[in-house]
């Protein structure tokens, strides 16, 4: 696998020099300064590419070219945004970039309730607490109809949780959920957030699929033509939240994807941390079944807690993900491609990482501190080497 690292651009506290020392060779990057929907010009792409290459690295994957909200809701100028998206893909291809990760999650890119959950060893992780989230939705946001989402017991626990919250607690939880995380292109006030949710109130999962199908059938042929592999990222967490439709969460959703637009350019990001939150997702089976369409891998593990809808991000080789067999399946696919004359390795990045050691004293992007990811990348490098020696290079 190609060892890559997500870099948020010149303002990232983790520098390209740091990344090179970590042993990564590929950079995962996006032009975050360009507003959603606008074309990424060849000039802007080349400017960023030159910065990366001057550091001795390669711009391996774009993550993400954001899908404008009006494309998802099929309102306003969505056809213009789609044409702009096509042009961005053409421009990326012209600059030699061949892999684009994106998602079709409405409103929020990824959602956590705690961005600094302290683990027993003193390091900090990201966490999603189902009861804290219910308290936010029922008593802070007060989303109409939210009570239908929760059991009577969950509502009772959420009320008790909310009653113990201080004003500072409420502010922090709200900020964690809606203020925008790394990779989320927008942050919202409570009022703006509810307004965004309201745009989806008449969009069922079935209708949302028709919007996604329209997008795919417009975009994927262009990607196919210019030689770009599109790798959709799953919902995070992979289930409906906030009354929003979520349609990239299961192996059935992956099959729908392939059936809806069956071109090789239409593929997946295997994010083990997102898919792995659901106990009914067999990550090894998913990787094996759709291996020929996996163009990017986010390797991360989560640990479900006593409430099975609550989880925190575990160390990369621990938690609920069978990382040994997922990586083995990815390598099996990579060797299959190699036998067919394909030289492109599957880009892999250590997804998130615990805040630990010296990083505990620094301001870092939640989930994207340096040392936790350095540790994860080193572990995956060792796992890959061992798997290759035992199973693939006899």
UniProtKB/Swiss-Prot annotation:
GO biological process terms held by the UniProt record: D-glucuronate catabolic process
Classification via Pfam families: UxuA
Gene3D superfamilies per the UniProt record, alphabetical: Divalent-metal-dependent TIM barrel enzymes (3.20.20.150)
Family: Belongs to the mannonate dehydratase family.
EC number in record: 4.2.1.8
Function of the protein: Catalyzes the dehydration of D-mannonate.
A GO molecular-function descriptor: ferrous iron binding
Needed cofactors: Fe(2+); Mn(2+)
Record-linked InterPro entries: Man_deHydtase (IPR004628), Xyl_isomerase-like_sf (IPR036237)
Protein name, UniProt field: Mannonate dehydratase
Organism: Mannheimia succiniciproducens (strain KCTC 0769BP / MBEL55E)
Enzyme's top EC category: lyase
Coiled-coil regions, chain positions: none
Keywords: Iron, Lyase, Manganese
Catalytic activity: D-mannonate = 2-dehydro-3-deoxy-D-gluconate + H2O
